[in-house]
Regions:
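N-terminal nucleophile
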Residues: 19-277
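Bacterial N-terminal signal peptides
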Residues: 5-17
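N-terminal secretory signal peptides that target proteins for export/translocation
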Residues: 1-2
């Protein structure tokens, strides 16, 4: 334990990445699926956001590590390793609290035992909020969180959409992402007029509240990698702005990445069998 405290204390002197965002993490005990989705106004490539934020342990649980993100990935690996051990998410938050920068972090953690926990640090940018719960009458559990959101009901609206959606757990997560987007999402970006010769000039932009977005689902039979999010997963859809990676937005899509994520999700959903629920 002393080694853990010393390791986390060292984070105080190491760089963090400021990552305003909203995210949805969820599990379905009846199918063993774990899902994470997120969007942010940080304009990185298509791997930047999931690369620093997502913690995925097939058959065990899922988490989002955001706000002032640990650039060393020590926090993310702590969550990854503890989920593999079966540690209660509330106990994982307690372990994370040893980090001197804990109050600048935001976490949402859910495991396949239905246990969940969240933390929004006191120095997270306004509006910052996290809500956990269970869909009544189901084995679906969730945590929805965000920071530097537009004033209003971004996270509560996402929760309502998640609860009211029908279909598979991924359908619920996608509905929650759209509700957060419609509620204003990340407060720092919008749709500025592009230059006439810019790659985005011929692509519509409707109510843009993020620059990048993704959704990832792991079946319980999927496998881990050697880090917290580089395993082999059944579904992983990413969206980035034009010229920002292999999954960049292109003509026929929308510069609002959540709208484009919906298009790509619907295309993927059509490939799934009728038994997918």
């Amino acid at each position: 334990m002393r080694h853990l405290f010393l390791l986390l204390a060292s984070l105080l002197a190491l760089p963090s990445t400021a990552l305003a965002t909203w995210s949805v993490v969820a599990v379905d005990r009846s199918t063993g699926r774990v899902v994470i989705a997120s969007a942010t106004c940080v304009n990185g490539d298509d791997q930047f956001l999931p690369g620093v934020q997502a913690v995925v342990v097939p058959g065990k649980g899922v988490a989002a590590c955001q706000a002032s993100v640990d650039g060393t990935h020590t926090n993310q690996m702590l969550v990854f390793n503890e989920l593999q051990k079966g540690t209660d998410p509330k106990a994982i938050i307690e372990l994370l609290s040893a980090d001197p920068a804990f109050q600048s972090r935001q976490f949402g953690i859910v495991d396949l035992q239905g246990r969940r926990a969240g933390h929004s640090g006191l120095t997270n940018g306004y509006v910052a909020q996290d809500i956990q719960g269970q869909v009544p009458g189901t084995e679906v559990f969730y945590s929805i969180q965000g920071n530097i959101l537009r004033p209003g009901e971004v996270v509560p609206n996402a929760v309502k959409a998640f609860l009211n959606a029908k279909g598979a757990i991924t359908d619920r997560v996608m509905a929650a992402m759209e509700a957060a987007d419609a509620g204003g999402g990340d407060s720092r970006c919008s749709c500025p007029p592009p230059a006439a010769d810019a790659p985005a000039a011929t692509i519509p932009c409707d109510g843009k509240t993020a620059h990048v977005a993704y959704i990832l689902m792991a079946e319980k039979s999927d496998t881990n990698g050697d880090s917290h999010n580089n395993g082999k997963y059944t579904m992983f859809l990413r969206v980035a702005q034009p010229d920002k990676g292999a999954n960049a937005i292109h003509e026929g899509e929308n510069l609002n990445p959540v709208k484009t994520l919906r298009l790509r999700y619907d295309a993927w959903r059509k490939t799934q069998p009728a038994s997918f629920r």
